[in-house]
Design a protein with these regions (language model features):
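Conserved short loop/turn motifs at secondary-structure junctions
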Residues: 22-25, 56-59, 112-116, 219-222, ...
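N-terminal pre-triad scaffold of radical SAM enzymes
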Residues: 35-79, 85-111
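Mobile, glycine- and charge-enriched loop segments
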Residues: 50-56, 66, 71-82, 127-132, ...
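Hydrophobic faces of well-ordered beta-strands that scaffold small-molecule active sites
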Residues: 52-58, 108, 139-143, 173-175, ...
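Glycine-rich, proline-tolerant flexible connector loops at the mouths of alpha/beta enzymes
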Residues: 54-60, 81, 109-121, 183, ...
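Conserved Radical SAM active-site core
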Residues: 77-216, 220-237
Length: 363
């Protein structure tokens, strides 16, 4: 086993840490030292180390009907709960997009549930209609579980499903539905959702197509510390398989589980936020995921001050002002920023804010 200083050097030199080395970082590294090493790595891999990027987009849910039965989600309803059903209409999309454009937004983050009746044709028609009306808006839409679900009910392979979605206007694929990429955890918190292997397969296929993607982690529920590390290693290894010149994962975004009103809470699993733990996750992620350039601080779930600290601990992006967000908010996340507020928070942390697009290019 390498000493901590040797593990740091290995990461800085571009080496892929072993599971044991990553666990040693997470378990043993003094937090201040870990954060400093992560910040040094951030400075060496981003284009401008004095800049922190941010975005204006809108998160619109296609539907709240979902068959996955995730124990951490308050937002969904079952197919038989017809009094709560909704499917967003084109008119509603247009109203939301018009407001987003007024606020300077350039991207629609489209996510929803695993609706048993919404197959590939529904999403093709939706994407084409949105692109015909708003050709300059980027569609950052769905997620690996939704792609797998659409493929299943449409009688297609996931690869063919991705190809048809891209042809219809899909610009990039969010990292939604990762949670913790460990089978033990997934079988408990989201037993009906596509498996770890399916999530990985869809993302790998997206990478082979050169479709930009992101990766996420929702932590702080039933997973162990080492299962968090296993999650990071799985993402890192998947990124290592991306063909040279292809996008792969353009960002990693971890956030804490919010338990209010969820089925997990009713079973005694309550979120306990620790700023120090979050900083340790951000710093460890930077050193383990040394092949992913961008790491986002999740101000929505951890708040302004902790997110600002994360910018000195490996994170280089402050995310979006989130004109609309329903899923995490429904479980207790209540932090908010407007465009001026998010820029001021970045300046207070000692950085220059720069508005970006989904590919992390300055706007």
């Amino acid at each position: 086993m390498l000493a901590l200083k040797d593990i740091y050097r290995k990461s800085h030199d571009g080496g892929l840490l072993t599971f044991e080395e990553a666990c040693m970082l997470y378990d043993k590294a003094p937090l201040a030292e870990l954060a400093e090493e992560a910040d040094l790595l951030r400075r060496s891999v981003v284009a401008d180390p004095d800049v922190v990027t941010w975005q204006i987009d809108r998160n619109v849910n296609t539907t709240n009907v979902c068959t996955s039965g995730c124990l951490f989600c308050n937002f969904h309803c079952k197919p038989h709960q017809t009094d709560r059903h909704f499917i967003t209409t084109i008119e509603q999309y247009c109203a939301k997009i018009e407001r987003m454009i007024e606020l300077g937004g350039d991207q629609l983050l489209l996510q929803g549930g695993m609706h048993p009746k919404l197959g590939i044709e529904f999403y093709e028609e939706l994407f084409r209609e949105l692109k015909s009306r708003y050709p300059n808006i980027r569609l950052h839409a769905l997620g690996a579980p939704e792609v797998a679900h659409i493929a299943k009910i449409s009688g297609l392979t996931t690869q063919k499903t991705l190809e048809r979605l891209v042809s219809a206007g899909l610009d990039s694929l969010p990292g939604a539905g990762a949670e913790i990429l460990v089978p033990r955890v997934r079988k408990i918190i989201s037993p009906a959702k596509p498996s770890v292997e399916q999530w990985v397969e869809v993302m790998h296929e997206a990478h082979l197509m050169n479709l930009p993607t992101s990766a996420t982690m929702m932590y702080g529920h039933i997973e162990t510390a080492h299962e968090r590390v296993e999650h990071l290693i799985r993402i890192r290894d998947l990124q290592a398989s991306v063909p040279a010149g292809n996008y792969g994962f353009i960002a990693f975004i971890p956030w804490i589980f919010c338990s209010t009103g969820t089925q997990l809470e009713s079973r005694g699993v309550v979120s306990h936020f620790s700023a120090l733990e979050y900083i340790r996750i951000i710093a460890t992620a930077r050193l383990v995921l040394n092949n992913i350039r961008n790491i986002q601080a999740s101000w929505l779930t951890v708040g302004k001050k902790t997110a600002q600290t994360a910018l000195h601990s490996g994170a280089n992006d402050f995310g979006s002002i989130m004109i609309e967000e329903n899923v995490v908010s429904s479980a207790g996340a209540d932090n908010h920023f407007d465009a001026e507020g998010i820029q001021q928070a970045i300046r207070e942390a000692g950085f220059t804010p720069r508005l970006r697009d989904q590919l992390y290019r300055y706007r």
